[in-house]
Design a protein with these regions (language model features):
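Short, low-complexity, Pro/Ser/Thr/Gly-rich segments in the mature regions of secreted, periplasmic
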Residues: 245-285
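N-terminal signal peptide c-region/cleavage motif recognized by signal peptidases
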Residues: 9-11
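Short helix-loop boundary/capping segments
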Residues: 130-206, 211-212
């Protein structure tokens, strides 16, 4: 399991520049937006591929739209004043970053031809990236499972998960292709909630299941993820907001609601459940 998590958390690194011994690095790979060296950049081409996959699989979240999102990895990462650009050999295109640090990308053929990167003025390992796919009109403190399934598919296709380890291309191809990663029975794809989590409940009609603790906090509490493996994860500063979901379990329909109880709510999550509804805890995998 630790190997799977490490591979999942390293899936995007094949597109990030790695310095090779004895080979002078391409200056463009290290001196980037506003002079930032070794930036937390992503492949523009792969992110557009993710957008194309979103359109192809839009039926999974028919009323939702796609945005990308920046999240901190380190406690000292400054998330205000981020400058985001698409940068190629000769082209530089500013990207508008919303107040919630989400953004969209426009297709630019010149940027594609120049194999451009999407670059914020922050260093590698300081931030991570995710997709944000949200169906409007859901109850407060809920997400929709189909949206989150699609977030996984698009995020993997776009190469968003950040890491500092070098990864061979074969591992990336296995994760993103042949293994059909997001449809697995025990998918180690980390999601992030808005605030520190107390519990997560899956609800579909009268069926309700509370996620076990090993599916929260990157699985550290019950050994699903070792503390050593956290070095290969992109969740360091947001560990208390992380959770896994049974994405490949099709007994849960796409319209399943994911309900969040937060640490600062001060509510008893069991007390919010109607007595006539059976509640079970998902057993650790």
């Amino acid at each position: 399991m630790h190997v799977a998590i490490m591979l999942a958390c390293t899936a995007a690194c094949a597109d990030e520049p790695q310095e090779k011994p004895g080979v002078a690095p391409d200056p463009r790979e290290f001196i980037l937006v506003n002079g930032t060296r070794d930036p937390v950049n992503k492949s523009y081409r792969k992110m557009l591929n993710g957008m194309a996959l979103f359109e192809k699989m839009h039926g999974m979240a028919p009323n939702a739209s796609l945005r990308f999102k920046l999240l901190p990895r380190q406690r000292d990462t400054k998330m205000d004043g981020i400058v985001l650009e698409i940068v190629g050999d000769t082209v530089t295109i500013p990207v508008l970053l919303a107040a919630d640090r989400t953004f969209t990308l426009e297709r630019d053929q010149q940027a594609l031809d120049e194999n451009a990167s999407v670059m914020p003025n922050r260093k590698a390992s300081s931030m991570t990236w995710r997709t944000e796919i949200r169906t409007p009109g859901l109850p407060p403190n809920t997400r929709r499972l189909g949206d989150l399934r699609l977030e996984c598919h698009v995020g993997m296709e776009a190469g968003l998960i950040s890491n500092t380890l070098p990864v061979i291309g074969l591992a990336t191809n296995l994760i993103q292709g042949m293994l059909d990663f997001c449809n697995g029975s025990d998918v180690p794809y980390l999601f992030f909630s808005e605030r520190p989590l107390f519990s997560v409940t899956m609800a579909a009609g009268t069926r309700r299941e509370i996620l076990s603790v090993d599916e929260l906090y990157a699985g550290v509490s019950f050994g699903r993820t070792s503390k050593a493996d956290l070095a290969y994860c992109d969740c360091q500063v947001l560990l208390d907001r992380t959770y896994f979901l049974p994405l490949g379990d099709r007994s849960w329909p796409d319209d399943t609601l994911i309900e969040f109880e937060y640490m600062d709510d001060g509510n008893d999550p069991q007390g919010a459940v109607a007595p006539s509804v059976a509640v079970t805890n998902r057993a650790p995998q």
